[in-house]
Amino acid sequence: MNQNLKELWLKKLNTTKRQRYNLSDGDKGLCIMAVAAEAAAELHIIPDCDMQGRDLLTDEELKAIGLSQEAQFYLSTMNDTYVATGPDKFPMRLINAVRDLPVKEPLLIEVKPNA
């Protein structure tokens, strides 16, 4: 996962209405993975994907954003389990779990031409 995606995902978690126990419904709220997909689509990492009626990303979408299935299931379980300050807010524990996800930094390797 790159830093830009992580930052946009965190920003959206603080402003998006949360959907719990149900599949994503754009009008009432989004689940944690739908917010991730929305952020990734905005950054053109994945094509716009309709999360209506589902709450998990496909293997291809996960690979594109750099997230494992295990991380997705962990975050999805937290989305449904933890209580926030309001019924449609994402809990701080969940936001902090996203904040703690590892970021893949590009390697800056100096290549020396063969002399």
Predicted regions and their residues:
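Domain-length accessory/inserted modules outside core catalytic folds
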Residues: 1-29, 37-115
